[in-house]
């Protein structure tokens, strides 16, 4: 007689749970996944954890998915629950990690720029709190129990009818709540709804949901499931903003907002000179010291230095965000835009096009493959004649900025040239994963760092800080080598260097360390980074004006006396009287005295006026690009000339 092993006996005793219990566990897993995410990250916006909108959306989505599962046979039910639940667990983790790194949660727009960042994913970034991991584990355990102990039985006829009715009712409820929150009306109604003389109109939940351009607030307002579905819809299937009405509105705005060039002592100061335009990867202000980066520090001492320069991140892809704005003078839209727009929409006022119109060659240089961010095509659309990667530059290791100098003879020419360079070595993570960058400089880094001034609390933080400094030294080696070559061949006097950082040093695995280093935990204010202009023989200046990436293009236009229409740049000449205010994502702003996020009901007329200006100018700039407005201007101009 065959004997039955103890494990088999125990397995047989694991009876399937009643269907209602397994479905209840699934429902609770769906609901608690969202609730715990909003519980731990509620500080990312002013939406209450108990606001009815996210609670209702999440209850309805949880009900819809659970009711659909009830209608399926056991195998289909198990597959459906796992297929709908596991991706949302991964999205919840992604939102947590991105918020810790960038201050902004995930949006589908990030997928368009994921190529570069994906190669730098590090386990060190997944530093969720114990409470967060515990809540995720509880939710996953509940769903696994629901799946494992799912009975074979299906609901009876009456049960299936009830499940179908619940599924339809919950889905219909989602549509009803969506329609209740989304503003519907013509453009005039919309304009009045958002008018600033209506005290209740500013940044209401309805406004936030309709625009769906503030990821943090939208996630807290709608919950994980509705945020994901609506976010995918507005990003992957953007509405056509190039309507005749919107074009007419842009016409009216630009016609009523002329912008004349400011006549300053710096106007035309570099006319006829060459420009090497360098965007430095993650070179934060605290890295620029005579010990860490002596070459960049020297340039700051001898050049035109702006200590209050900020690099706001309107896209989570911080590098491309600054790359786009610095080159075009426009703010990159996050939603309602396809990645293809960047390679297709007309950009006649980009720096590359303006320099080429002035008789310069214009080429871009970056070690990364041209397929990353689709840079190869996008840079051509910016107006560059070519995009040159590590192979074109003769580099052996694309991560080493010092090897960019192998392409010096391509970057520098005896004919007028404009060269745009993006460095690489400062990119995180600051671990042994990138030791090919840090190892050559580690001994020197350890020798020059005064660890008594570094606010580290663990040995891991100390090592990460050291490797960040070592990687910055590699970028500094390129900067120093470039200056030496320019001086050696006589180009230092006829060539201008403009160096700016794409974003702050955001790749520390422990955000508390970078916050302690920079003295703030606000992700907007963390974006204070280096910006300097240098050429041989220039009189050093330090400007305390508050400026940002959006001011770069109009400043270069004025310095080099380029012919353009300044109305189409959202920023201002850094040396002129206008501007002095930094605009951030979600319409926050900072002028050195007032930092306003728009979350309070201010009655200060000056603050309200600035809020209106910031919101209007950001929307206009983003819609100018979204709607391909410059293509309409070119078409209109062509039709006029034909007549």
Label the model's feature ranges.
Residues 20, 50-52, 61, 133, ...:
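A residue-identity detector for tryptophan
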Residues 25-88, 184-204, 392, 402, ...:
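Charged/polar interaction segments and conserved charged motifs
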């Amino acid at each position: 007689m065959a004997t039955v092993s103890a494990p088999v006996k125990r397995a047989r005793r694991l009876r399937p749970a009643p269907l209602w219990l397994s479905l209840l566990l699934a429902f609770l897993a769906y609901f608690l996944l969202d609730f715990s995410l909003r519980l731990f990250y509620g500080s990312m916006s002013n939406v209450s954890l108990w606001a009815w909108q996210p609670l209702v959306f999440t209850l309805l989505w949880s009900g819809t998915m659970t009711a659909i599962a009830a209608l399926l046979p056991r195998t289909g039910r198990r597959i459906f629950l796992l297929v709908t639940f596991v991706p949302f667990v991964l999205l919840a983790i992604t939102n947590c990690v991105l918020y810790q790194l960038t201050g902004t949660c995930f949006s589908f727009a990030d997928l368009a720029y994921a190529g570069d960042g994906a190669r730098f994913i590090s386990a060190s970034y997944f530093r969720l709190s114990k409470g967060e991991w515990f809540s995720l584990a509880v939710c996953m355990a509940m769903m696994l129990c629901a799946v494992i102990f799912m009975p074979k039985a299906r609901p009876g006829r009456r049960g299936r009818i009830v499940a179908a009715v619940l599924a339809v009712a919950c889905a219909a409820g989602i549509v009803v709540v969506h329609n209740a929150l989304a503003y519907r009306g013509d453009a005039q109604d919309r304009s009045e709804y958002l008018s600033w003389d209506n005290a209740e109109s500013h940044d209401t939940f309805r406004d936030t949901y309709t625009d769906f351009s503030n990821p943090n607030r939208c996630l807290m307002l709608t919950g994980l499931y509705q945020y994901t579905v609506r976010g995918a819809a507005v990003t992957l299937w953007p509405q056509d903003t190039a309507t005749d009405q919107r074009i007419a509105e842009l016409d009216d705005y630009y016609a009523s907002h002329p912008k004349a060039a400011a006549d300053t002592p710096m106007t035309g100061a570099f006319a006829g000179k060459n420009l090497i335009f360098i965007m430095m990867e993650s070179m934060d202000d605290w890295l620029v010291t005579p010990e860490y980066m002596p070459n960049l520090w020297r340039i700051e001492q001898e050049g035109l230095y702006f200590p209050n320069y900020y690099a706001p991140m309107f896209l989570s892809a911080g590098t491309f965000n600054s790359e786009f704005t610095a080159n075009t003078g426009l703010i990159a839209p996050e939603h309602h835009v396809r990645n293809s727009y960047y390679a297709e929409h007309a950009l006649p006022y980009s720096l590359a096009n303006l320099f080429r119109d002035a008789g310069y060659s214009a080429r871009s240089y970056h070690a990364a493959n041209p397929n990353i961010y689709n840079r190869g095509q996008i840079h051509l659309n910016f107006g560059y004649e070519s995009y040159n990667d590590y192979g074109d530059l003769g580099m052996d290791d694309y991560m080493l900025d010092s090897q960019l100098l192998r392409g010096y003879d391509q970057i520098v020419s005896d004919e007028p040239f404009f060269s745009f360079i993006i460095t690489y070595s400062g990119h995180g993570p600051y671990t042994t994963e990138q030791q090919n960058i840090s190892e050559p400089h580690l001994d020197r880094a350890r020798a020059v760092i005064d660890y008594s001034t570094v606010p580290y609390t663990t040995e891991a933080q100390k090592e990460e800080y050291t490797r960040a400094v070592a990687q910055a030294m590699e970028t500094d080696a390129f900067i120093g080598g470039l200056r030496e070559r320019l001086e050696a061949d006589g180009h230092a006097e006829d060539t201008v260097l403009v160096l700016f950082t794409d974003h702050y040093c955001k790749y520390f695995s422990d955000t508390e360390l970078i916050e302690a280093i920079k003295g703030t935990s606000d992700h907007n204010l963390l974006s204070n980074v280096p910006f300097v202009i240098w050429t041989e023989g220039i009189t050093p200046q330090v400007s305390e004006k508050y400026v940002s990436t959006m001011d770069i293009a109009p400043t270069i236009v004025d310095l080099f006396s380029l012919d353009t229409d300044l109305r189409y740049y959202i920023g201002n000449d850094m040396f002129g009287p206008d501007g002095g205010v930094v605009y951030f994502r979600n319409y926050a702003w900072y002028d050195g005295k007032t930092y306003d996020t728009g979350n309070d009901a201010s009655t200060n007329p000056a603050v309200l006026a600035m809020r209106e200006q910031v919101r209007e100018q950001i929307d206009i700039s983003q819609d100018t690009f979204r709607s391909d407005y410059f293509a309409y201007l070119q078409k209109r101009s062509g039709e006029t000339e034909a007549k």
